[in-house]
């Protein structure tokens, strides 16, 4: 096994431990807690894949970080915060909507990259809205936390979520997964609306003037799958 893979896992375990202690002191906001839960699942999956114990890896990671901090204490940091692209978190859903349990009468499940698509094929003739919580960097969706499909009476009938044990997803993965979910829901004569915030950061492309426009194909798809404005 590559030594960098092991040390990377060890450092990730220790940093998650620090973040968990921060959250235990009631200082974490909703996006912070969302990422904490997601990363915990990811670490468990990596632990199983690599055959490494999380507790012992956390201790090893502590030693690595301690050594780095000691080295940094005698020298100026080589990077600056201004060189890091600004990332921010956007929410369509409340914590209650994200954590609410739901079940499917006729389950259908697909996978796009590291994203899992789940939908209830028993739902017919409904007005459905897609909502999502995700992070944005460079004005594009960076990481999807969770997307869910809601009926007008707030019932959950579908979702797209990352698979914790697999590597990260791309903006294109998210778009493809949304199109598959829409296609599955429309098959049963449902009308699907995509929230404005999700459209804005998932389907936008830069034009020559620095603005953002849907491509002709995407615009046709959105017009065909988004219900009328009220």
UniProtKB/Swiss-Prot annotation:
One of its GO terms (cellular component) is host cell cytoplasm. GO terms for molecular function: protein serine/threonine kinase inhibitor activity; RNA binding. A motif (Nuclear export signal) lies at residues 137-146. Residues 223-230 are annotated as: PABPN1-binding. The keyword Ubl conjugation applies. Upon interferon induction, ISGylated via host HERC5; this results in the impairment of NS1 interaction with RNA targets due to its inability to form homodimers and to interact with host EIF2AK2/PKR. SUPFAM superfamilies: Ns1 effector domain-like (SSF143021), S15/NS1 RNA-binding domain (SSF47060). InterPro entries: NS1 (IPR004208), NS1A (IPR000256), NS1A_effect_dom-like_sf (IPR038064), uS15_NS1_RNA-bd_sf (IPR009068). Keywords: Eukaryotic host gene expression shutoff by virus, Host cytoplasm, Host gene expression shutoff by virus, Host mRNA suppression by virus, Host nucleus, Host-virus interaction, Inhibition of host innate immune response by virus, Inhibition of host interferon signaling pathway by virus, Inhibition of host PKR by virus, Inhibition of host pre-mRNA processing by virus, Inhibition of host RIG-I by virus, Inhibition of host RLR pathway by virus, Interferon antiviral system evasion, RNA-binding, Ubl conjugation, Viral immunoevasion. A motif (Nuclear localization signal) lies at residues 34-38. Residues 180-215 are annotated as: CPSF4-binding. Residues 1-73 are annotated as: RNA-binding and homodimerization. HAMAP family: INFV_NS1. Homodimer. Interacts with host TRIM25 (via coiled coil); this interaction specifically inhibits TRIM25 multimerization and TRIM25-mediated RIGI CARD ubiquitination. Interacts with human EIF2AK2/PKR, CPSF4, IVNS1ABP and PABPN1. The dsRNA-binding region is required for suppression of RNA silencing. Belongs to the influenza A viruses NS1 family. Inhibits post-transcriptional processing of cellular pre-mRNA, by binding and inhibiting two cellular proteins that are required for the 3'-end processing of cellular pre-mRNAs: the 30 kDa cleavage and polyadenylation specificity factor/CPSF4 and the poly(A)-binding protein 2/PABPN1. In turn, unprocessed 3' end pre-mRNAs accumulate in the host nucleus and are no longer exported to the cytoplasm. Cellular protein synthesis is thereby shut off very early after virus infection. This is Non-structural protein 1. It comes from Influenza A virus (strain A/Equine/Prague/1/1956 H7N7).
């Amino acid at each position: 096994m590559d030594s960098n893979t092991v040390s990377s896992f060890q450092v990730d375990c220790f940093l998650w431990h620090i973040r968990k202690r921060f959250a235990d002191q009631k200082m974490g906001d909703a996006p912070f807690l969302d990422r904490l839960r997601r990363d915990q699942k990811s670490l468990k999956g990596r632990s199983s894949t690599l055959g490494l114990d999380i507790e012992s890896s956390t201790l090893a990671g502590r030693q690595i970080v301690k050594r780095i901090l000691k080295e940094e204490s005698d020298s100026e940091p080589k990077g600056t915060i201004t060189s890091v692209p600004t990332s921010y978190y956007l929410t369509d859903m409340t914590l209650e909507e994200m954590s609410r349990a739901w079940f499917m009468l006729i389950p259908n499940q697909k996978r796009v990259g590291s994203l899992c698509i789940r939908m209830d094929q028993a739902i017919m003739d409904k007005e459905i809205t897609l909502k999502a919580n995700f992070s944005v960097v460079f004005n594009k969706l960076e990481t999807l936390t969770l997307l869910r499909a809601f009926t007008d009476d707030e019932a959950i009938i579908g979702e797209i979520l990352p698979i914790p044990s697999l590597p990260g997803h791309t903006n294109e993965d998210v778009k493809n997964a949304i199109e598959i979910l829409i296609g599955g829901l429309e098959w049963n004569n449902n009308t699907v609306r995509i929230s404005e915030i999700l459209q804005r950061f998932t389907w936008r492309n830069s034009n020559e003037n620095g603005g953002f426009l849907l491509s002709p194909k995407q615009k046709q798809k959105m017009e065909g799958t988004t219900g009328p404005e009220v």
